[in-house]
Amino acid sequence: MATGKVLRRAVKAAAAGMIHYSGMRRAMAAYRRSQSGGRRILIVSYHRVVSDFTGELQRSIPGLLISQETFRRHLEEAHAAGFELASIGDAVDVMNGRRVAKKDLCVVTFDDGYRDVYRYAYPVLKEMGVPAITYLPTAFISTDKRFNHDRLFHLLRRVQERRFRPLYDSLPAPALQLLGPILSGQKTVSASLDDFIGEHPTRVLTEIIDALEQQLGGGADLVPEQGDIMNWDEVRRMARDGFEFGAHTLGHTVLTLEPQEVVEREILESKRAIEREVGITVRDFAYCNGWYSDEVIRVLSANGFRSGVTTEDLPNRIGGDPFTLKRKVLWENFSLGMLGDYSSALTGCQLDDCFGVLGMSSPVPGKRPHFISAPTVGNQLSSAPVRVSPKPATSNEIVLGPETATTIQEAP
């Protein structure tokens, strides 16, 4: 597994060097600009900006992390690549034809409201005069709570460290899907967790966390110290300096796995909380896990939102749908060269989407049919999803079921 990653990194770094120094990068950027309707609109997404990447890597989900130094260099690279660092509103206006951009646009976004963003990203953005928007799951703001993905990552690492063998009979049924590949060595904790979270609603994740904590014997060491979230005073301070905030549900909820009443509550109460606490109008939304559906978009459109951002790594096009904005999710290793150090050539090629032009990337679709999980049966939860929308799946839809991204098992 590690050898394959190193080989892929080496191939990509070598290709980036050739593209960058041969002048092909400029031609590819021009091609993407033409494809996008005359202006590129790049939206980049970050989660946690940290002071010590290597140290934090030992206890946190790697793909959420970027060092403050690398983050600063990304902003410098975007500027050097000819992008105007703009707001989400500017991007929507250009896409809708209400504004003509003189340059390509790059929008900086943050998901989840981690306190690291306030500590380490905010000072850099302020110093460089770069606008940004942070999407907040409001039930976590000004609390000591941690996200389910951070709690699960922490617990799974404890399971590994203790060489603990869980009692599956007393765990919710879907736990085997999460733990099996990790304990067998087929997947890393991060990879298994990433696959699992997108397939199961919040209540399943919470039940697995509670059951694992009980089996591991409880104790303070089962709750991660890292991953703390901003408080409202910090949010207000950033807002006073012109930084924007959008809604990201109440409880970091993957909405395509929830019934309609939950979707509406998660969206509207998140929006209202920010407006009440910060005194701003909230018009922008980020889909948790990057997943959205027609049903979710209808709720946003009917309630004063102007945009929704996905995690689909694809070009945004002039005239495109502002509720399916594409984003490039970035972290530290996004810029890692062949020798494991920062590569300006690789970063520039990534920002210019050279690998997308060459067909070397495989974007994950964010549009999903709208499902909820089957109800609890006894003390066991079925992981088979139930379609909310009555229409059958089409060839363009990605239908998720247990342990597969292409098939569906209907609940009885």
Regions found by a protein language model. Give the residues of each.
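Extended, charge-rich helix/loop segments that form flexible
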Residues: Q35-I41, S45, K145-D241
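Short beta-alpha junction loops
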Residues: T138-I141
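Short, glycine/acidic-enriched loop or turn micro-motifs at the edges of active sites
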Residues: Y114-R115, G251, L255
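C-terminal active-site subregion of NodB/CE4 polysaccharide deacetylases
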Residues: A2-T109, D116, D144-P166, P174, ...
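CE4/NodB-like, metal-dependent polysaccharide N-deacetylase domain
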Residues: A101-K102, Y114, Y122-Y135, L176, ...
